[in-house]
Amino acid sequence: MSSILKIFSILLCVFMFACGSSPDENNETPDENTPAEDSDAVTPDNDADQSDTDTSTEKTDEERDNDADTALSDEDKVENDDETTDGDADFEELQTGGIYIFSDFDESGSAKSRNILGNGGFLGFSIFSLGKKYWAVSAIHESIPAFDWDNATGRLYIFEKNKHVESLDDAAFVLNHPDKSLNVGFGYTAAAPCDINGDGFADLAVSSHLAAFGDLYAAGEIVVFYGSPDGWNEETYSISRLSSAYIQKADSMSQSLACVDYDGDGFADIFAGGQNAGPELSGGGSQGMVAFFKGRAAGLSENESWVLLPEVEEKAQYFGSSMLIEDLDGDSLPDLVISGWGLKSDKSSANSGGAYIYSGGTDWQHGATHKIFGEAGSQFGSALKTIEIGGKKYLAVLATKDKNYGTVNFYDPAEDFAARGRFSFPSAFAEEGNISDFDTIKLSSDTDLIVIGGKNFGNGGMTYCATISNKTISEPEACKFQPESPEGGFGNAVFNNKNGEIVVGMPEYIHRF
């Protein structure tokens, strides 16, 4: 019996990078699933947007059946792989996607592992935080029912940070696009839960950055699930998108999301980024844009109130590709960071990528208070995260094309975002690929581990680890905890779930059975 290959092949209408992650996040870096401006399939090389969020929905019996047996042990995986080495063997293949969870780290960087397979649809494409209580994993092309590729809507799995996770059934909430819209990239990222309508319950704004509006493909939209005593469901929601003044094809609006009560009126507001959005420039193209959507008693406003744009009026800067909002400098006021992996410091400079920082307590419409830029062509700003090293908080920025393989750059918010070192591969490093995502985890009181994922490293993705102690970063080496033969885009997303664990996405994983 010939093998039956049931792998869904997606036309990734993307923006010039292979995201993986970001998806973020929020995770995020430039995204394989974000359309390139005026193009049907162009991308950078990474993913993500790491954001903070919450969600709620009760699984049906059919969904529970589909999720059954998704947690595959390492031993089972090896056994299944061995069974397929015989050319005459009968087996089936399903593109499930999945995640690895690594726990119980020792001081050497070794850890225990378990993995969870998805129901198709690139589970593990992006992994990100949803505030203090939850973390989420996206399956941006999952279908209802599972593996029915003609009905791919996307799905978001939300887990509690203090709960042990063994399978998708352990999700506190599972959300689908409430309109069951197809191929919209639902769940790519989400904002931290916040009270948008002022009723005392946290609401959840979720990305649907590939959603069409009429003939405008991938214009993007924000789906808000309104909270209740039981969390979120697909019955109470609203959809917001750009107004006619801005909306265009391939905007990818909501590729990045952040929530804060910006104007202090008691209603949380949403900032939504789209790396291809913004007014069309005289020579064609756009800069990228972040739009402000106002919270109110009736829910999130249908359209934007105002927008943020790069200071340099040049196309292809991808402003809004990643975003985070957090108190970075310890003054109890939220700071906003927006990156664009093609930003320019001035009209005459090359597209290096950069990040604009809007300090809390200032009028963000009047411009950024700090700006940082990378080297020419480095795609600096592909992903943004805050990390802790030695108990101190840093802004970490990924430059996917810097120094051949990518670098992670650290900035100190307490010192006006002064550069404080970076992770990079040594000159003798001889792999192919680029960094997709990264995060850190504490090994001991004086040692942190930085985990670097690259979905294109090796034959199916890899993670590399380096210790950080006394402000010194060790030479990176293949992480001791990763599978012997990683595959399926392993390392596309890397995330510390704040439960003493590192979660790694492998969205292209193929399950053989």
Model-derived regions, located:
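C-terminal motif of bacterial Sec signal peptides marking the signal peptidase cleavage site
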Residues: 17-18
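Structural signature of WD-repeat beta-propellers
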Residues: 151, 208, 217, 274, ...
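Sec-dependent signal peptide recognition
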Residues: 3-10
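Blade-edge motifs of beta-propeller repeat domains
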Residues: 90-122, 126, 134-135, 146, ...
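Acidic/hydrophobic-patterned starts of short beta strands in beta-sheet-rich repeat architectures
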Residues: 83, 132-138, 198-207, 264-273, ...
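Ser/Thr-rich, Pro/Gly/Ala-heavy low-complexity intrinsically disordered linkers and tails
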Residues: 23-90
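Short glycine/acidic-enriched loop and turn motifs that connect beta-strands
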Residues: 141-147, 210-215, 276-281, 342-347, ...
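Beta-propeller blade termini
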Residues: 125-138, 188-198, 255-264, 321-330, ...
